[in-house]
C-alpha cells in the first residue's frame, strides 16, 4: 500500500514516524512480560546442543562443554573450560600493568568502598515486598532488615555490609517488621439537643499498622537468587520489546564489586571500548585507523544473542584465574555473584496471552498449553502452588555484568595469534585486520570467530561486515569513513525543544549542533541546515510559527517581537552558535537598554529563578497544570502520581521517598560543596547541618537580636 495515498488519512509529516524511528515519542512497552522472559530463558537451553534438546539441557548444571559440542554454524551457549583458563592466563601475561592496577584497587580502594553507592541504581527488586522500588528505599529497607536480625548496626563499608548479608543467609530463620498504611472505617451517630440520635455517619481514618514477616533460610536464598524482570522501555527502531533484569539488594553489592574491578582492568586495556566517554571512543577509533600493511580490513558488527549465550561460570572461571595469587577470601568474594546468577530465578510476570474468536485473556504460565511447556520442570511455585518464577542455570539477562562480559570477549579477541586491533564494548565490536594477503585476512577473521565461540560468544554473520581496505565501519552507533566519525544523523530528529524554558531549550539545541561541528560530525553546510531545522522546531514549540493564538496576541500589541521565541528572525549562524541570544542581540543593537533591563530583571516572572518543576518519567505519571497565572509559568507542569497509589498500603513508602528528597535537598543547601564532591564532617548529619546553619547566621549581616532569636529557635 502506498503510505501517501489519501485513504490512509496520514499527512507526509505523520508518515515520517512510521518510516523513521527517531522522530516522535519513543515506544513504551505495556502488558504482561511473561512471553519475553520465557523466550529469554528458553534460548540458552535451545542453543546448548548442536541438535536442539531442551529437556536434556535442563539438567545441565554448568555450561562447560567439549569443542566438538560447539556449533560453528548457529549460536552456541556454553564454553570450553581449558580455553577460558588458557586465554585468561595469556591476557594476564600480556598486560601486567593492568593487573598491578587491579592489585592496588583491591588492597586500597575496595576496603574504602561504601555501601551507600548502591543507592545510585534505578529500580531494584525489593526481596521483602516482592515489588520494584527506587534503589535508595530498597537499600534502606535491607539495612533495617539486617540490623533487626543481627542486633547490631552495620558499618559504612561495602565489605561490612556484604559480611552482614552472608551472616543473615547462614541464619535458619529471619524476621522483618515494617509499617503499612490502612484505611479504617469509623461509624458515628449524630446526636441532637433533644437527645434523639440522627443518621449514621461513616468516615475513614488512615492509620499505620506494623506487620512482621518470617523468612526461612531456603526462602531467603531463593529471594537472593530472584531477579526482577521488566520491559526495556523507550527503545527506538525495534519491532519487539525486550526485557531487562534487576537483582535484589542482597546480590547487588557483590555484583558492584566485580563490575568495579572489571572497570579498573578495562580502563588499562587498549582494546576496551568501555568505560570511556564518547570523545575518547572516537579518538580510539581514529588512532586504530592509522595502520600500514599490505592488506587491511575492518570487521564491524554485533554478537548474536549475546546475553543468552553467556555463561556465569565462564566469567567466574576467568576471574578465578585473574585472582589466583590473591587470598582465599578475595576469590570467594568474586565467586559469590556468579554462583547467585548460576542459580538465578526469573520473575515471570502475570502470564501468557491467549486469543480465541476475538476474546483475549491472560492465563498464568502452566495453566494452559504453550510453546514454553518444556521449561515447566524448572518452574518455582509459591505456597499456594502458583508458578511465580523459573529457574535458569544457563545464560544471562540484559543489564547484568556488562563489564565482566566485555572482559570475557577480550580474552578471546586480544590474542597474540590474531593480528590487528580489536575494540569491544559489551556485545558491540570492531576489529582492524593487518595481513599479508586476503586469504590470510579471512583466516584471521575465522580464527577470531572461533576464539569467541570457545568462551561462549557468537559473532552474528548477518550483522557483521568486513570491508577492505580498512576505512569504513561502525562501532557503538558511530559510523566512520577514514577520520570522519559521527552519529549526528540519528541524533538530530530527536532534538526537539521541550517548550518549558525558552532560554535553556535554545541553548541545548545550539550546543548539540556546535558540538557536532566541533567534532567533525557535520560540516558547516550540514550545520547550517540543522540550525534552520532546529530554529523552525523551536519557534513552533513556542507557538511563534505561522498564525497561532500567540502570534495574534503579540500582533495585537503592535510591538515588534524581540526574541526568537516571540517570532523575531534568528540572529544565530554557524559562527555564533556559542553565544547567548540576549547578549548577541544586545551586541548587534537589536535590543535597547530598556528591553534588556526588562528581560534581565530578576523579579521578572519570565527570567525569575524558579525551582525545577518537572520531575518525570512521563509514562508513569499524569501531568497536572499548576494554578499559576504569571507569564513565566505558562509552560509549567508538574507530574503527579496516580491517586490509586496514594490510597494503597505502599503509601508509607511514598512518604519515605518524600522524606528522603526533603532531607537530601536540605543537606545540599547547607553544604553546596556536595554538588562538586564528597565532603566529610564530624558527627551526625543533623549535627553537621546545625553547625553550618549556626555559622551562616553568625556570619550574616542580620541585627544581633534577630541572630539571637534565630539561634534560640534552632535550639528549641
From Swiss-Prot:
Catalytic activity reads: RNA(n) + a ribonucleoside 5'-triphosphate = RNA(n+1) + diphosphate
**Superkingdom to which the source organism belongs:** Viruses
Q: What is its EC number?
A: 2.7.7.48
What range(s) does the RdRp catalytic domain occupy?
Answer: 286-465
Its EC top class is: transferase
Do the record's keywords include Iron-sulfur?
Answer: no
Q: Which GO terms describe its molecular function?
A: nucleotide binding; RNA binding; RNA-directed RNA polymerase activity
Is Cell division one of the keywords UniProt gives this record?
A: no
Q: How does it assemble?
A: RNA polymerase is composed of three subunits: PA, PB1 and PB2.
Q: Which family does it belong to?
A: Belongs to the influenza viruses polymerase PB1 family.
Q: What is this protein called?
A: RNA-directed RNA polymerase catalytic subunit
Q: What is the lineage of its organism?
A: Viruses, Riboviria, Orthornavirae, Negarnaviricota, Polyploviricotina
Amino acid at each position: 500500500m502506498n503510505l501517501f495515498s489519501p485513504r490512509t488519512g496520514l499527512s507526509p509529516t505523520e508518515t515520517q514516524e512510521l518510516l523513521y524511528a527517531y522522530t516522535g515519542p519513543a515506544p513504551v512497552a505495556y502488558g504482561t512480560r511473561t512471553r519475553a522472559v520465557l523466550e529469554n530463558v528458553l534460548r540458552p537451553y535451545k542453543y546448548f546442543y548442536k541438535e536442539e534438546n531442551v529437556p536434556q539441557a535442563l539438567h545441565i548444571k554448568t555450561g562447560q562443554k567439549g569443542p566438538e559440542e560447539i556449533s560453528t554454524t548457529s549460536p552456541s551457549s556454553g564454553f570450553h573450560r581449558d580455553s577460558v583458563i588458557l586465554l585468561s592466563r595469556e591476557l594476564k601475561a600480556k598486560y601486567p600493568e593492568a593487573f598491578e592496577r587491579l592489585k592496588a584497587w583491591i588492597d586500597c580502594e575496595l576496603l574504602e568502598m561504601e555501601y551507600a553507592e548502591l543507592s545510585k541504581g534505578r529500580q531494584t527488586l525489593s526481596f521483602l515486598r516482592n515489588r520494584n522500588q527506587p534503589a535508595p528505599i530498597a537499600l534502606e529497607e535491607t539495612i533495617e532488615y539486617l540490623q533487626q536480625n543481627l542486633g547490631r548496626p552495620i558499618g559504612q563499608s561495602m565489605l561490612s555490609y556484604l559480611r552482614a548479608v552472608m551472616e543473615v543467609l547462614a541464619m535458619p530463620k529471619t524476621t522483618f517488621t515494617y509499617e503499612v498504611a490502612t484505611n479504617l472505617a469509623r461509624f458515628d451517630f449524630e446526636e441532637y439537643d433533644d437527645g434523639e440520635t440522627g443518621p449514621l455517619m461513616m468516615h475513614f481514618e488512615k492509620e499505620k499498622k506494623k506487620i512482621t514477616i518470617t523468612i526461612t533460610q531456603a526462602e531467603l536464598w531463593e529471594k537472593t537468587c530472584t531477579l526482577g524482570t521488566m520491559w526495556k522501555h523507550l527503545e527506538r527502531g525495534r519491532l519487539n520489546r525486550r526485557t531487562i533484569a534487576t537483582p535484589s539488594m542482597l546480590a547487588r553489592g557483590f555484583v558492584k564489586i566485580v563490575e568495579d574491578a572489571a572497570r579498573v582492568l578495562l580502563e588499562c586495556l587498549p582494546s576496551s571500548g568501555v568505560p570511556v566517554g564518547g570523545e575518547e571512543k572516537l579518538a580510539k577509533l581514529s588512532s586504530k585507523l592509522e595502520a600500514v600493511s599490505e592488506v587491511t580490513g575492518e570487521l564491524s558488527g554485533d554478537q548474536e544473542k549475546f546475553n543468552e549465550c553467556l555463561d556465569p561460570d565462564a566469567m567466574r572461571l576467568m576471574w578465578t584465574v585473574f585472582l589466583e595469587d590473591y587470598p582465599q577470601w578475595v576469590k570467594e568474594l568474586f565467586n559469590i555473584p556468579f554462583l547467585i546468577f548460576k542459580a538465578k530465578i526469573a520473575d515471570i510476570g502475570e502470564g501468557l496471552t491467549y486469543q480465541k474468536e476475538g476474546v483475549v485473556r491472560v492465563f498464568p504460565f502452566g495453566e494452559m498449553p504453550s510453546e514454553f511447556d518444556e521449561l515447566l520442570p524448572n518452574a518455582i511455585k509459591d505456597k499456594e502452588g502458583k508458578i511465580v518464577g523459573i529457574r535458569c542455570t544457563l545464560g544471562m539477562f540484559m543489564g547484568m555484568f556488562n563489564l565482566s562480559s566485555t572482559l570475557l570477549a577480550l580474552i578471546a579477541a586480544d590474542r597474540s595469534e590474531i593480528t590487528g586491533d580489536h575494540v569491544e564494548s559489551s556485545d558491540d565490536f570492531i576489529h582492524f585486520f593487518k595481513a599479508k594477503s586476503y586469504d590470510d585476512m579471512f583466516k584471521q577473521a575465522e580464527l577470531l570467530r572461533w576464539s569467541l565461540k570457545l568462551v561462549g560468544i557468537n559473532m552474528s554473520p548477518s550483522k557483521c561486515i568486513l570491508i577492505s581496505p580498512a576505512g569504513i565501519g561502525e562501532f557503538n552507533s558511530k559510523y566512520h569513513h577514514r577520520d570522519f566519525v559521527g552519529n549526528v544523523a540519528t541524533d538530530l530528529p530527536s532534538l526537539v525543544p521541550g517548550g518549558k524554558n525558552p532560554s535553556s531549550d535554545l541553548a541545548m539545541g545550539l550546543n548539540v549542533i556546535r558540538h557536532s561541528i566541533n567534532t567533525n560530525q557535520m560540516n558547516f553546510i550540514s550545520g547550517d541546515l540543522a540550525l534552520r531545522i532546529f530554529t523552525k522546531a523551536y519557534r513552533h514549540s513556542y507557538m511563534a510559527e505561522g498564525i497561532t493564538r500567540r502570534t495574534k496576541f503579540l500582533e495585537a500589541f503592535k510591538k515588534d517581537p524581540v526574541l526568537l521565541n516571540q517570532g523575531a528572525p534568528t540572529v544565530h549562524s554557524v559562527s555564533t552558535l556559542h553565544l547567548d541570544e540576549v547578549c548577541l542581540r544586545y551586541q548587534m543593537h537589536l535590543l535597547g537598554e530598556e528591553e534588556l533591563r526588562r528581560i534581565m530583571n530578576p523579579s521578572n516572572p519570565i527570567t525569575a529563578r524558579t525551582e525545577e518543576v518537572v520531575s518525570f518519567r512521563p509514562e508513569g505519571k499524569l501531568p497536572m497544570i499548576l494554578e499559576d497565572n504569571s507569564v513565566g509559568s505558562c509552560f509549567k507542569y508538574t507530574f503527579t502520581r496516580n491517586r490509586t497509589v496514594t490510597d494503597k498500603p505502599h503509601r508509607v513508602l511514598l512518604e519515605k521517598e518524600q522524606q528522603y528528597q526533603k532531607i537530601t535537598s536540605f543537606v545540599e543547601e547547607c553544604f553546596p560543596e556536595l554538588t562538586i564532591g564528597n565532603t566529610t564532617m564530624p558527627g551526625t548529619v543533623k549535627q553537621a547541618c546545625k553547625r553550618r546553619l549556626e555559622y551562616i547566621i553568625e556570619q550574616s549581616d542580620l541585627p544581633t537580636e534577630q541572630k539571637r532569636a534565630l539561634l534560640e529557635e534552632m535550639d528549641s
